From Swiss-Prot:
Principal EC category: hydrolase
Taxonomic source organism: Pseudomonas fluorescens (strain Pf0-1)
Membrane topology listed for this record: Multi-pass membrane protein
GO BP terms, alphabetized: proteolysis
The protein's name in its UniProt record: Lipoprotein signal peptidase
Any one Gene Ontology molecular-function term assigned to this protein's record: aspartic-type endopeptidase activity
Subcellular localization(s) per the UniProt record: Cell inner membrane
Amino acid sequence: MPNAVGRFGRLSWLWLSLLVLVIDQASKFYFEGKLEMFQQIVVIPDLFSWTLAYNTGAAFSFLADSSGWQRWLFALIAIAVSAVLVVWLKRLGRNETWLAIALALVLGGALGNLYDRIALGHVIDFILVHWQNRWYFPAFNFADSAITVGAVMLALDMFKSKKTGEAVHD
């Protein structure tokens, strides 16, 4: 295997997952201590605010109104996905840096929200994007942002790979 990285593959990128996890947890700790529930601090009028919200469901509060079983379902899913991401990361070759970064971002975000879900029973969200008082995107957090960026990078890699037979970036 000419492009192999060795026994541990691209696991050296776990530092990025750890960084995402630390920033995510530190930011949640900060905003939970600074804000009351649903309080808004306007950063950019009519566009961007800090707020505090708890999400017992998944993305966009999916299943948030359920009786509590969803906490463990989503925790199990996050654990399974995290395990798959670590194995995938380990198996990457030397020329798959773009993919390694994408996987590390998703993993760090998944672990950040997993910690909240298990330790607190809900995920702490604090970023609110809106247009005046007419449209509000659901509140989210740093972990969600890392997952989204990583997922977009994975999609770009997949589309490029399908089209040309090679990865988007080295």
